[in-house]
Amino acid sequence: MTELAELAELEIAGFADGHPIANLLLIRRLLEYLRPLNRPIALWPCDPQLVGNGVMREGHDSIVFGLPGIPAIAETTAIAALLECVEEVGTPVHLMRLSTARGVELVRLAKQRGLPITASTTWMHLLLNTASIGSYDPSLRLNPPLGRYADQQALLQAVKDGVVDAIAIDHSPYTYEEKTVAFAEAPPGAIGLQLALPLLWQILVASGQWSALELWAALSTRPALCLSQTPASITPGQAAEMVLFNPHQSWIADSQTLKSRSMNTPWLGQAITGQVIKLWSPIASQETG
């Protein structure tokens, strides 16, 4: 366990662990130590023992594709245990990387009971499901794995309703050599910083399923609130923090247009409508188009 109090004194935004913590005693101790520090903690609910050697969500598609499956209870049992810890200790927790319909339901019920939790899912879990894995594209091997269609629809509705507070990018770059292997041997993850907003807009907003404000709340306003931060605003005389986005700009996702040194995305080589043109932040502004 790191020096939580000393880090809190340095005014860090919060704490997180990119890997699941299977030790419930450690989780309980973390929550107890964090309670007086007034800093959020983000945890990924996942039981590594139930994950085993799985590489995609267990179910019909995993059988058809001949790939070892990961049961949904690898997530939901971990959520249930974590919620019990939160209820006992009272420390606010952000649940990262939700990927199952049952996980959404557990979060919904916990919020109705008044537990101090927030939650997020990733943008790729909103746009894709296990049916996409039939291509065996290694960029579709994610952690947690893509859910079934019912999981995808539950996540979409939960984000729109605010049960799932935020959309995470979970940008995970890998080299060409690391991802140019068989699906089951590839490390899990895909890039997304440059792709998430255009594709979410193209598939959800341009189609009329979501409003622009609903998408922006899930990508910007509510994530800030999950971290106990003040959402960005436009105030005369203050440093700008804005994104200039052209929803009609068409481009091809390739080595010339992607700013990342990694190309591990299932949208590589595809035409995308919508592009971030420029960023403004208190640190610097940057042209991206």
Model regions and ranges:
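Residue-level signal for pocket-adjacent positions within structured domains
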Residues: 62-65, 121, 137, 141, ...
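C-terminal cap of metal-dependent C-N hydrolases
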Residues: 182-185, 239-289
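Short amphipathic alpha-helical segments
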Residues: 28, 107-108, 179-181, 255-257
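Flexible loop residues that form catalytic
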Residues: 20, 98, 172, 248, ...
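Histidine/acidic residue-rich metal-binding segments in metalloenzymes
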Residues: 2-167
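His/Asp/Glu-enriched, well-ordered alpha-helical/loop segment
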Residues: 63-90, 160-161, 165-167, 172-247
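Short, positively charged
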Residues: 145, 211-212, 255-260
